[in-house]
């Protein structure tokens, strides 16, 4: 049928109006709100049907079988490093393998651990416990009574959710304590005051949780009392994120600290003195790390001018507790940031502080000790330019463990004795051959001119011909840094098969301190997407890859990031893996823990929506745009980021006639599968998709 120019114009206007109405309807009336009922029959049936179609297609990808088999081998390997945790004179470890799918909690002596063959003693078998009790238990950790190291509160989750059941356990008798402390399923927090007393925050009943779903009331709970008989010592507001009490047990004293967090990176702390709470007069975004040698250790997230002195953001400060309570503000500066050098992490031993920094995103390690009231600092040598992860430190002596790795060097565990040098005690297997691979650090220029660093890992035989399958991973939120580390998954499934891997250090993370983070929050959050887009464009300009061969991947906040990137620039990418993502930013604060992140993104129920609506992925999907065939995956039991975010994105894309892939695991919390085999399968699906789209 032939149309005249006038008729064509009328038809074009009509089509535009229909498209606009569709987008408007998507913004105002959400036809997929029913997907927020996590375990409704309708939602689960929808998820099951599309998940089965996705897995069937991905399992037929030629690379899937080999990648999956390799991941099963890696994740179940008995040659993995058993991460140690000091408690008393012992080292504890939680371990999963094919014989212990749910896992075993075990221990050994330090001397035995440092030998080639470790003599382990099983303390609790979670597989046996789950079978006996008929529960889908997933191990979530333990809180020891630190001065005795016999009794502990064990956290067990049903299906991997953040909410846990907590039960008192006797590590000497290796059994749960009869009539011991017990907390039903909730997002509870506990801290031991003494062997017969806990501070507890939990779901005490109606109106005892914050809008974010965390405890707002802290109570002192004595042995023999029912939970309802516990004594309230502090109440926060429902609009706070959480409130709780933590006890620092130190050789010189015991310190009880009550904290309330009105926002994600803001808190007010009180020192409990007798029955009184004394407010610690600190900036609301400062973090009390702990109390050490009768000194407060304080980390600053913003510049602080007080009593004629100026202390920079990202500094670590110390001051005597008594001096501070008397009004003195003459702080000792233990760390002060420099250009592209930022604070990263801190632990303590009996007499030393151990901290790591990031120097242009690579780790350095330092030890501080007091001598005649002066802090003496020394650097602890590392094998190269990579990443340090402080594993565990002893409070009985000055020993500690740390992990070191880089992109091409498998993770090694080092042990440091009292004031000594690192000794390598365990090394992970090399799961891929790095021969011929290269790593460089480049910079992209973002929209506002800021230089954004990224690591480029090139496979053997690499040529800058714009044809390389390239995967960019980024996160960019909550002050979480992305560091150069060894990944057996990336190496074996991607690099060794000829793919290029990119780790982008975009704003929103903590790679260069708190200011790098705050440069991408709330009204500045578009910066997050601009930085990732800049990295993608830089890779194309350098002929590393082209849009046809370029994929992006992110999870949680990173899932929001990659979702926003492909809705804004669908022309740049041919593959998108969005895992356990946020996406519907109009309703995110009403779903599970979403309200706790409003300091990061904004409150959509206020004028903040005026900027949020410009980048919220769900509201910005359009029937007029051509999108890549994106892949979303999530977990039904994720009780942190609601699975409806991923569900709704997929449903909307389907409504608009777009091809999309989706997988929802019925188990697993926000972190993924509940056991190594589930994690191996889920990871293999992602790489099968990437090879399908980018080869």
Regions found by a protein language model. Give the residues of each.
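Structured core elements
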Residues: 153, 191, 199, 256-257, ...
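Beta-propeller folds
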Residues: 13-17, 23-399, 405-411, 415-419, ...
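Bacterial N-terminal signal peptides that target proteins for export
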Residues: 2-13
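Active-site-proximal cap/loop segments of hydrolase catalytic domains
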Residues: 490, 496-497, 503-695
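Cap/lid segment of the alpha/beta-hydrolase catalytic domain
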Residues: 124-145, 156-161, 175, 180, ...
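Secondary-structure transition/capping motifs at alpha-helix termini
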Residues: 113-116, 147, 159-161, 171-175, ...
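Glycine-rich His-Gly loop
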Residues: 96, 405, 473-477, 556, ...
